[in-house]
Amino acid sequence: MITDEKKDERLSIILEPGQIEASAVTPPFLHLPAANLFELRAARLEQLAEGNALGDYLRLIARLCRIQQQLVDNPPGGMPVAEARQRLCMDHGLPPLAADSLVREGPWLVWLQALLEHLSGETRGPMGEALQVLRGSDDNQRKGWGIALLAGQYDGVPAALVPFLGAALQAAWSSWLLALPAHQLKPAGSLAQCPACGSPAMAGVVRNRGKHNGLRYLACSLCACEWHVVRVKCVYCESSKDLRYTSLEDDRHAPGKAPLRAECCPGCDSYLKQNYLENDAAAEPLADDLASLALDIRLDGEGFHRLAPNLMLAPGGG
């Protein structure tokens, strides 16, 4: 049986990737997150926690997601980027919510403080200890941790603090994204780079409804913006040669129907997880990524490298 990827692969032999992208109907470039993104994410995490070896951790992240939703619904701070600066960035094809600059400017720190206030009753156990470290830190220290986390410098951030820092950062940037005139966003310099904030993609999503049906979108690890990238192309080296698709061995679906598959590139030895909503309409990039760390372990053993961050978990911190 020919899988969806095999069909795409045969097509890519006939047409170059650029020709596929420039088809008669231009695909919608963006797919923005829902206003209740974090509520949906929490529900998915709770569903996936059942029977999962990391069930307790997934439930913790679900709890943080519900707090994230409360923060987005009642923002502790406003849009930090003036309209003139937004327009200037978008006119020049630059991300208006540039993470590398805003994380240093610090408007997200009030979001972290608000998150800590929601968790003020947590004082015991490993979680209480991690929160106490955050409560006892000043803005300069918190900012330094945030900078290190978004730069992927995990040795500069205590692993136990990552979910709380990541939750605050995600809530802030997702809220700002929803306040942007996003239709003016333009593709970034790299396929795997978010056009809204410049952060790396966390995973891919092959959508199954309406004008987005059958199209692949990459989901930002920070603001949750999704942008279109043609299928059967490595998002890191842009090669379409000899890509293979790997799923969990204990998945109950046939290989070509697995709802989560990793696109593995032998050219640069990288991989990217992808959710196929046709096979599981409830899939959610961050939740399904955390629930499938066994696939990361397997691919690491095969010599493939993960370049996509998940801000709710430090590598090796599971």
Swiss-Prot record:
Gene3D superfamilies assigned: FdhE-like domain (3.90.1670.10)
Keywords annotated in UniProt: Cytoplasm
SUPFAM superfamilies according to UniProt: FdhE-like (SSF144020)
GO CC, any one term: cytosol
Pfam family, any one: FdhE_N
GO biological process: protein maturation
Locations listed in the record: Cytoplasm
Gene Ontology molecular function, alphabetical: ferric iron binding
Lineage: superkingdom: Bacteria
Function: Necessary for formate dehydrogenase activity.
NCBIfam families documented for this protein: FdhE
PANTHER family: PROTEIN FDHE
Similarity comment: Belongs to the FdhE family.
Name of the protein: Protein FdhE homolog
Originating species: Pseudomonas putida (strain ATCC 47054 / DSM 6125 / CFBP 8728 / NCIMB 11950 / KT2440)
Gene name linked to the record: fdhE
